[in-house]
Amino acid sequence: DSIDPLTGDDGKIRAVPFAVEGYGILYNEEIFDKYCAMEGAKVSSPEEIKDFATLKKVSEDMQANKKELGIDGAFASTSLASGEAWRWQTHLANIPIHYELQDLGADDSDNLQFTYNKEYKNLFDLYLNNSTVEKTLAPSKSVSDSMAEFAQGKAAMVQNGNWAWGQISEVSGNV
């Protein structure tokens, strides 16, 4: 698919996307295959995860079975070291803001109420509570730490974007 240029009301092209980023939850297919083959797995395929409730069930079950899966946690560590919280302050925060703006029928607002704060907190807590490290250690973790955990197969999932492959592929021992 192509991305259409941005046009004004007069139909004239005003901008052309130069780069498009996508982000979400990346998952390790090998770990998920192992999980889905386990007796009692909450899903038989990662494609079945289409809502928060299912993601929560799977994440918590993976965390409970981390030894059997050979991982340290369902999610790679949440990087909260100084200057490293951009995944949570911008990327993750964009989601509730998007839905609030959609509810307002607007592209921008000077007065956001953060009406989807509960959903934001639920996802953030899911990351913290089902992590490779105790949540008290999150303030000492960097994005590099988190991506190394994911790259080395110590975590089944990590929140990041399409730019992450460069970082994953450079980690010694990546799987």
Model-predicted segments: where are they?
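C-terminal lobe and pocket-closing loops
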Residues: 163-174
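Short, polar/flexible loop-turn hinges at active-site or ligand-entry regions and domain interfaces
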Residues: 37-49
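Extracytoplasmic/periplasmic solute-binding protein
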Residues: 7-19, 23, 53-109, 155
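Stable alpha-helical elements in mature extracytoplasmic
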Residues: 2, 28-31, 51-58, 84, ...
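Beta->alpha turn/N-cap motifs
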Residues: 143, 160-165
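Extracytoplasmic "Venus flytrap"/periplasmic binding protein-like
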Residues: 1, 5, 12, 30, ...
